[in-house]
Amino acid sequence: MTLKVNLITGRTINQGANLENKTSPDYLEATAYCELNSNDIEKLDKSGNNVKVRTNYGEVTVKLKENNGNPDGIAFIPMGPWANAVVDHDTKGCGMPGFKGIQAELEGTSDKILLMKELIARYK
Amino acid sequence: MAVITDALCPFCGCMCDDLMIVTEGNRIIEAKHACKLGAAKIMGHHRIKEPMMRPDKNSNFKEVSYDEAIEAAAQILVKSKRPLLYGWASALCEVHKKGILLAEELGAIIDNTASVCHGPSTLAVHEKGLPTSTLGQIKNRADVVVFWGCNPAQAHPRHMGRYSVFAKGFFSDKGRKMRKIIVVDVRKTDTANVADEYVQVEQGADYMVISALRAILAGQAAVVPDQVGGVTKEQLVKLADTLKTAKFGAIFFGMGLTQSKGRYKNIDNAISLTTELNSFTKFVIMPMRGHYNVTGFGQVCTWETGFATAVDFARGAPYYNPGETASNDVLYRKEVDAAMIIAGDAAAHFPANSVRHLAAIPLVQIDPYWNPTTEIADVVIPTAICGVEVEGTAYRMDGVSLRYRKMIEPTHPTDIEVLERLIERVKEIRGD
């Protein structure tokens, strides 16, 4: 089933360590995932190891990971092109887009995760 | 083999100044004392070897000379009616100075990565000022440290060791043992795991929680409900007591405040809380700046233009109004018709709708590395790495300026050289 969550994005150490290595598989590994706690993972259908994240602003497929530091209903994706495929562009009059607090719907999927080049090619 | 001692790290706003760099020939073979982030940057990755151009964004790049790439970049910028010059945070202040000159010459908008980081903090400082200090004062004096919406364990790995949690100083010779560490966040991070107290706030409720703390400090605890933003009144009262009984307190804040509901108003409220805490004791507040020299851009831009970032030169004089002139404002509105991205990666760190417009307009990239911005660029000019191959000045997160030395010799022209040639060519084409 579809799980409704509040999505936040942010820094991680592996995302930072690959900041200048963005064409590498290490960068994809470090940023193309979504963390949920085990309760929320239980609620997701298990039609694959990946998760499709859908918001009013876009859709992206990333790997599903467990992090029990997240409270119920909070999903976290490290900052980067995969997270930014679904964040809110509205700057609320102060220049800053909505990188945190985005209403999102998640569902399990076996769809593949796009490579950085493939993801960015969607914008051309 | 040569060893450079007390070298500065060019990764995050901590600007650790105790690295030991071991070089062999013109190659760095070790970056001692650096954290995972700093070491990754200093040890380096695959570089863009030569300048590149392509006739359209779906064609393959072809390597060209620096002359050809700079000419093409100058033509793109001169033909543009509304150019955007964005990035700057991974570059030194000397580069920023040239960038602002180019922006003025072009009548462009110049904006830095604070736009998607601590830009809202700058807006809050306009309203309330900033009761702050140096990191050294915090290291030597602080006995209560609050991390609000930031996760230094992952984003500023040596901050806690050098300045805020474990560091031993003049009045803090017992280090971690004499400090009370409080983490306020929406999820239990690695930083929360080392804290004495973790306060879990509902996402987007920081403003309310700060307001409740201010009410309690003002002696108005009676008006505070049993629970505010997911935090019990009991925990809030205890927290307010810990804060006001500190000998020297420090609040560090991050994107958890600047990017959540309320944006700059969260910071505005946190600054007011800090100011009010000074009625009881000494308290300071500081943004956890990300890129090592994102603070430096704000400094240079302020002394050159009067404004910290998002400065629009279209009227012939600097104009500033984030919400109107910041990068994502002008990209989402499809207002700019060409862009130059330098020392920052807009295509990786901007929302999809902004990247879509960047992909639709002529785009020049100046950067040592191939990244998502390269994927949508028309002209790519690789440069030397500031702080590793180029010397110059940068500003730490607390506003202290420090001088970077070269670790090795550059194999590419510097950003300064490329910008000087670009400015010269732009002036020639315009007949100035």
Located regions from the model:
Chain B
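N-terminal export/assembly segments and adjacent metallocofactor-ligating motifs
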Residues: 1-220, 255, 335, 422-432
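A short, well-structured juxtamembrane/interface segment
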Residues: 62-77, 231-242, 323-330
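Short, well-ordered beta-strand core segments
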Residues: 83, 145-146, 181, 198-200, ...
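Active-site-proximal structural scaffolding
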Residues: 95, 138-139, 174, 232, ...
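Short amphipathic alpha-helical segments
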Residues: 97-99, 158-160, 194-195, 264-265, ...
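Extended redox/cofactor-interaction regions of prokaryotic respiratory oxidoreductases
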Residues: 103-166, 175, 271-375, 384-389, ...
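Active-site phosphate/pyrophosphate-binding segments
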Residues: 208-209, 220-320
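C-terminal functional extensions of proteins
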Residues: 379, 386-432
